[in-house]
Amino acid sequence: MAQAVDWDRTWATDRERMELAVELSRQNVEHRTGGPFGAAIFERSGRLVGVGVNSVVRLDNSALHAEMVAFMMAQHRAGSFTLAAPGQPPHELFTSCEPCAMCLGAALWSGISRLVFGASGEDVRDLGFDEGPVFPQSHQYLAERGIGIEGGLLRAEACGVLRRYRELQGPLYNRVPAV
């Protein structure tokens, strides 16, 4: 997916940045290369520094959520384990869906200053994925540590990708337990 991205472009608006995250998720579903999740990390100026798509099933690795892949790429390109290292500009994560418990934890340690998501965790659970222990306090914890969180940007478009994944009968590897 990284090959299909215009790395020289300045992504000026939140909408443009989220459009990229949703498009990455859509391509991942249409190419049947992974789950319906895409993420991108930008410097606040709009410079793209990392992208990721869900590759859990394809690469047999439960950690390869879109956000985790984007964090790995961005930190590698920054030459630091944290995007908040001295001399680094503020970084922002745009992700097609609200992050799961693992990705929220990684967001805390990644060094991002802002997290923006499209579809909600409830939208993802309705598809059948189990997102783990994500609570309102999870978002509050990040906010108290200086990470701004905004949800619902291009939610309808992100939910369209989730519906398409269901139509194509994509695998649900972390299923919501039956009650």
Predicted regions and their residues:
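A short, polar/charged loop-to-alpha-helix boundary motif
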Residues: 56-69
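Immediate flanking context of iron-sulfur cluster ligation sites
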Residues: 84-97
